[in-house]
Amino acid sequence: MKKIIKKVRFHLLEKKYGSIGFVQIYRFCKKIFFYLMFLYIPASALAIVTNNMILKEERYAAILLSGYAFSDYDYWASPIAFLGSYPAWTLYFNSNSLKTDYFFNATKEDFKNVLIDPKYESIVMVGHGSRNGWKATDSFVSNDDVNEWKELFETKKGEWFQLSCAGQDTYPEHIGDLVMDNTNKVYYYSGEVAGTTMFITDAVTGFRLMKYQTNKRNLTK
């Protein structure tokens, strides 16, 4: 046991990783964490105030967080995605006079209800997917489903953001094109595969990467 403790102590406190040791790495990460919290907490507080007290109109952006937000099903995927995105996304939509309404472990029925309810003007979908669909917590939602519900809802006048892979699929139309009244406001990634770093970037910057890729893609049409 003493040998094990001694070895652990060596690797944590004495061994150098390049020109720095574990203690220096830990202190650096700790400092970064506190700097991030210094920004995150005030931004979250501001978002809560604007979303719940300042905005009066019942106009919403629905944010559908699938249980498959990262990889395989994980109950904590939705809460983690919420914590990471709440300040930036709420302030983004609040600046456009929309409140945010988060759906944890969102289902196919949640998506259908959002389409039908006219108070939802913008839609954000987080989870596995493609250009023709999105994997809700309970089942896959596709262009076929949206076309089946067409007579139940009016097209949305806000924005569509889909944080998922954007592989080519069965139909030429993106699923968002069937929902929104302006296809130029249907935002999705340009590559076949979208990584976690891309999701994180858009979570903390208010969709800047996705909007950049979409606008660049639209210019080449």
Where are these regions (language model features)?
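A short, glycine/acidic-enriched catalytic loop
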Residues: 129-156
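N-terminal targeting leaders characterized by basic, low-complexity, disordered sequences
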Residues: 1-10
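N-terminal Sec-pathway targeting helices
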Residues: 15-38
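Active-site-proximal C-terminal subdomain of hydrolase catalytic domains
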Residues: 159-221
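A domain-level signal for caspase-like cysteine endopeptidase catalytic cores
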Residues: 50-125, 139, 162
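Boundary at the C-terminal end of the N-terminal hydrophobic targeting segment
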Residues: 45-47
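Solvent-exposed loop/turn segments at secondary-structure junctions
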Residues: 68-71, 107-108, 128-133, 165-170, ...
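Active-site microenvironments of hydrolase-like enzyme catalytic domains
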Residues: 121-133, 176-186
